[in-house]
Design a protein with these regions (language model features):
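Short, surface-exposed glycine/acidic/tryptophan-bearing loops
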Residues: 1-16
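Extracytoplasmic and endomembrane cell-envelope/extracellular-matrix remodeling and assembly machinery
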Residues: 14, 19-22, 26-47, 52-56, ...
Length: 173
């Protein structure tokens, strides 16, 4: 698994995340976030609207959770998440995620106010792009972890640029 959302190559492929020797969309925050959300929706549907099962399946795999449910049914045991025999990491993952969500929801944590302004933009590209100056690619590299071999941008569906530099980069491409 790789990237912010820890997508496996198979899941990435299923949700149309591009992977090549030049570009790994699992490392791209935009492509991977879209795929992770699509994957969660898929799991939520597969587990009949049970978010606990869906979250567990995101962590340990759909098949593993389905087997645990099937085993509990055979033994006449409840099939809710808390009664399933799952790996320790998964048994802790779901409650930790729920606790974090509850903290955010209850406003018990203070976060600094941020300006709600668009900071980045995506610039569609096709083919290959070669960034000429080191300054150009050094400013883009932290926003484009999916691009494997800077300064050459090959196979990427887009690049992420600071919104205040969008016109400048549009002129280059």
């Amino acid at each position: 698994a790789s990237g912010l959302w820890q997508l496996t190559p198979a899941i990435a492929k299923y949700f149309n995340v591009q992977i090549s020797p030049w570009y790994d969309g699992r490392q791209d925050v935009i492509d991977s976030t879209r795929a992770a959300l699509d994957f969660m929706e898929y799991l939520h549907t597969r587990f009949d609207g049970d978010w606990y099962h869906a979250i567990a399946a995101y962590n340990v795999g759909e098949g593993r959770v389905k087997r645990a449910i099937r085993n509990n049914k055979k033994q006449g045991k409840p099939t809710d998440f808390f009664n399933l025999k799952l790996p320790k990491q998964t048994s802790q993952y779901v409650p930790k995620l729920l606790a974090a969500a509850q903290l955010l929801k209850s406003n018990k944590m203070a976060f600094p106010a941020i300006n709600n302004q668009q900071a980045i933009a995506t610039l569609p590209i096709s083919g290959a792009v070669m960034l000429d100056s080191q300054q150009e690619w050094q400013s883009l590299e932290p926003l484009n972890y999916g691009v494997i071999r800077f300064p050459a941008i090959i196979d990427a569906p887009h690049i992420v640029v600071p919104v205040n530099k969008l016109a400048e980069f549009q002129g280059m491409l």
